[in-house]
Amino acid sequence: MDSEVAALVIDNGSGMCKAGFAGDDAPRAVFPSIVGRPRHQGIMVGMGQKDSYVGDEAQSKRGILTLRYPIEHGIVTNWDDMEKIWHHTFYNELRVAPEEHPVLLTEAPMNPKSNREKMTQIMFETFNVPAFYVSIQAVLSLYSSGRTTGIVLDSGDGVTHVVPIYAGFSLPHAILRIDLAGRDLTDYLMKILSERGYSFSTTAEREIVRDIKEKLCYVALDFEQEMQTAAQSSSIEKSYELPDGQVITIGNERFRAPEALFHPSVLGLESAGIDQTTYNSIMKCDVDVRKELYGNIVMSGGTTMFPGIAERMQKEITALAPSSMKVKIIAPPERKYSVWIGGSILASLTTFQQMWISKQEYDESGPSIVHHKCF
């Protein structure tokens, strides 16, 4: 597709925004979904201080800013900040004029109706896009794995969903949501590191802990066994250098933090773990489709990137499933971006071109048209 008129694909996650052009095989821009505002009054004249910073710039100046995430648990909670992120995406990251490109946005499953309308309204009225579409994240992940039937475990920074899809349609009655994802694991890691005597408290320090989590954490195949190993030897200990040069050592925290995905009770949450929730979702589906779902469990999102997670999932689901059932976990290496990749595939299909909501249709029907045209 010609990038003159290529559609723009934007996957707005709670933690990272992924944006780029339809037809590309990876997003051009990936930056934190953060808006930062200075904590102090600027005193140096001519420094060109801004009243807000977005994405990587907010991240690099985090020491003097208060950082806010406008998307919580996958759902937009602050529209002014969200608009800043979109503005930054179009003009600074992709350097395009939004009025010249169709835009495909992604949304969390079970996104409130009013949110879809607000999204649609901002795109047409603030950014004047010529055409627009909104697609469910988990469905796009399945597309990117080359399937039309499967059950997607999508776990990002803000929310985890289990979405069964049959022949391209999600089965809404069986979609399950867990309000436990990457950000909660980061917070939990902050807590268990403080028990070791390392204190992290500010929004900026949380970002350091997120980095520790991404670099050093893994999922144990057998938690109890791993705890014993950790107690008896220092083989799993790793060191991490903080920005100020101080070096900290991290041991069983490496696998204790991600264990919360399988046992949310350690966070004081009543919900079932990702393994049990996946099983529960399959059991809510028609008995005839279950076999295909068990054989196509697709992982997507950054929080499924922990080493060992697919093996552990395989073990747990196999234990829950009927004994003769073939259980297959698909964990593509690019799963951090599979939602975006699915969007890129969808928006470049010739059959998709008549699916867009055009500016004209929007002007005639208003924001509610999104419910009739986007499934």
Swiss-Prot record:
Its EC number is 3.6.4.-. This is Actin. It comes from Saccharomyces cerevisiae (strain ATCC 204508 / S288c) (Baker's yeast). It is an enzyme of class 3 (hydrolase). It holds the Pfam family Actin. One of its GO terms (biological process) is protein secretion. PROSITE patterns: ACTINS_1 (PS00406), ACTINS_2 (PS00432), ACTINS_ACT_LIKE (PS01132). SUPFAM superfamilies: Actin-like ATPase domain (SSF53067). It is found in: Cytoplasm, Cytoskeleton. Belongs to the actin family.
